[in-house]
From Swiss-Prot:
GO terms for biological process: protein refolding. This is Chaperonin GroEL. It catalyses: ATP + H2O + a folded polypeptide = ADP + phosphate + an unfolded polypeptide. The gene is groEL. The lineage of its organism: Bacteria, Pseudomonadati, Pseudomonadota, Gammaproteobacteria, Enterobacterales. Together with its co-chaperonin GroES, plays an essential role in assisting protein folding. The GroEL-GroES system forms a nano-cage that allows encapsulation of the non-native substrate proteins and provides a physical environment optimized to promote and accelerate protein folding. It comes from Yersinia enterocolitica.
Length: 550
């Protein structure tokens, strides 16, 4: 086992604080509308330019192991805030730095660290309650656009794109961000249910100009089996032909004479048919077939539950307004399924999401909810260069997370104002700890709640104390707009923060800062002395002369 280096008390805390400050100072330059960029060197490819706090934090590793421990613990704050709400990483880092700095001063002055932590925790619990009171629901697309704009560093086009996407696919819909091919940002929306399976034969194509199949008001046959014998299909085909409507077959596979007969019937115009494979594999395929059945008011023909193809009637078939199939995808638009049944199915899948343990399962279940409840939107980010593309894509993803958080828990006044109002309310209510040391802990937390506003103002090149006092003197959503350099109602100016982002930033900052304040000893590996080993290996250089031995 390697020898250890151990530091105690103040020596340990000073080193730890130095590491915290190096990381936090690098991250906090990005805060606010006038925050600056940070350039990250990459071992291959061009450097990355970012204004995303967590991306900066992840890059930092310090040479001194004790300082690095401090930096890594604050990095955890940014990561946790990012995981919980997808944004607010810089705010969380600024809060943590302030709590740690003030807390360690109090420890150095002889306060009990455990009581300080208890005081900080009390203040944070009270602040979270105040934030909930200040929160207003975020329901209209204007508010969603404003949240997206603020999170994307005052880029209004991004905010509007996200608001449009949410309007189209609903709050449950899946919105993904991809790299585009042009200079402009684009929004592609797929309404209805889309799955990644294309036509089984190009002979089904009825729109040669687009290479796709379009079926108007089709019947939909869902079969959880391979279909290779056309005899099984005859009763259904005859019934559909009589009804004069097209038929979409979604089965495990359609092959052999069954596929050939369907193609011939389609080409002769006897009955218009298209066949695709069912999406997914194994149990997931069964579940997705059931989703499609719910959406189209059909029944999955499965021998497991005693249903056979020969006995299938028109009542067992699903229906939709329109189906579009191309080489790789199938889209079912406006299924005739009962709304209550669809919502019941969505609730059932949501329950499975809560019980799922792996991220992969959760993601797949979330996709199923989106396909049933809303649709899928793809935001394609446009930029002139690859460096700009990466930076912009990261901003759009951040903004998307922020808008989701806003829809979930509502919004509060942005620009650090909500935390200042929460702190003022706690002071007015006269929150007290069990002893004087806890009271100091409460003061440490309340002072830290001013730090995001102060940092936004510093980054804008203004005097922090003057502006912080002016904002504190106001009430409600009155604050300072660093972008336009004017005071006013933050909500009216469209400067909003998601409540969830502000809450998560404060909770994670206080949690990790509280643990760091109570640290009394730090242990790390001593650096290995490799000099002797290097010299030994270097001495072998003389072996080159052995060539003469040949």
């Amino acid at each position: 086992m390697a020898a250890k280096d151990v530091k105690f008390g103040n020596d340990a805390r000073i080193k730890m604080l130095r590491g915290v400050n190096i990381l936090a100072d690098a991250v906090k330059v990005t805060l606010g509308p006038k925050g600056r960029n940070v350039v990250l060197d990459k071992s291959f490819g061009s450097p990355t330019i970012t204004k995303d706090g967590v991306s900066v934090a992840r890059e930092i590793e310090l040479e001194d192991k004790f300082e690095n421990m401090g930096a890594q613990m604050v990095k955890e704050v940014a990561s946790k805030a990012n995981d919980a709400a997808g944004d607010g990483t810089t705010t969380a880092t600024v809060l943590a730095q302030s709590i740690i700095t003030e807390g360690l001063k109090a420890v150095a002055a002889g306060m009990n660290p455990m009581d300080l932590k208890r005081g900080i925790d009390k203040a944070v619990i009270a602040a979270v309650e105040e934030l909930k009171k200040l929160s207003v629901p975020c329901s209209d697309s204007k508010a969603i656009a404003q949240v997206g704009t603020i999170s994307a560093n005052s880029d209004s086009t991004v905010g509007e794109l996200i608001a449009q996407a949410m309007e189209k696919v609903g709050k449950e819909g899946v919105i993904t961000v991809e790299e585009g091919s042009g200079l402009q940002d684009e929004l592609d929306v797929v309404e209805g249910m889309q799955f990644d399976r294309g036509y089984l034969s190009p002979y089904f194509i009825n729109k040669p100009e687009t290479g796709s199949i379009e079926l108007e008001s089709p019947f939909i046959l869902l079969a959880d089996k391979k279909i290779s014998n056309i005899r099984e299909m005859l009763p259904v085909l005859e019934a559909v032909a009589k009804a004069g409507k097209p038929l979409l077959i979604i089965a495990e596979d359609v092959e052999g004479e069954a596929l050939a007969t369907l193609v011939v019937n389609t080409m002769r115009g006897i009955v218009k048919v298209a066949a695709v494979k069912a999406p997914g594999f194994g149990d997931r395929r069964k579940a997705m077939l059931q989703d499609i059945a719910t959406l189209t008011a059909g029944t999955v023909i499965s021998e497991e539950i005693g249903l056979e193809l020969e006995k299938t009637t028109l009542e067992d078939l699903g229906q939709a307004k329109r189906v579009v199939i191309n080489k790789d995808t199938t889209i079912i638009i406006d299924g005739v399924g009962d709304e209550a049944a669809i919502q019941g199915r969505v609730a059932q899948i949501r329950q499975q999401i809560e019980e799922a343990t792996s991220d992969y399962d959760k993601e797949k279940l979330q996709e199923r909810v989106a396909k049933l409840a809303g649709g899928v939107a793809v935001i394609k980010v446009g930029a002139a260069t690859e460096v700009e593309m990466k930076e912009k894509k990261a901003r759009v993803e951040d903004a998307l997370h922020a808008t989701r958080a806003a829809v979930e828990e509502g919004v509060v006044a942005g620009g650090g104002v909500a935390l200042i109002r929460a702190a003022s309310a706690i002071t007015a209510a006269g929150l007290k700890g069990d002893n004087e040391d806890q009271n100091v802990g409460i003061k440490v937390a309340l002072r830290a709640m001013e730090s995001p506003l102060r940092q936004i103002v510093v980054n804008a090149g203004e005097e922090a104390s003057v502006i912080a006092n002016n904002v504190k003197a106001g009430s409600g959503s009155y604050g300072y707009n660093a972008y336009s350099e004017e005071y006013g109602d933050m909500i009216a100016m469209g400067i909003l923060d998601p409540t969830k982002v502000t809450r998560s930033a404060l909770q994670y900052a206080a949690s990790i800062a509280g643990l760091m304040i109570t640290t009394e000893c730090m242990i790390t590996d001593l650096p290995r002395d490799d000099k002797g080993a290097d010299m030994g290996a270097g001495g072998m250089g003389g072996m080159g002369g052995m060539g003469g031995m040949m």
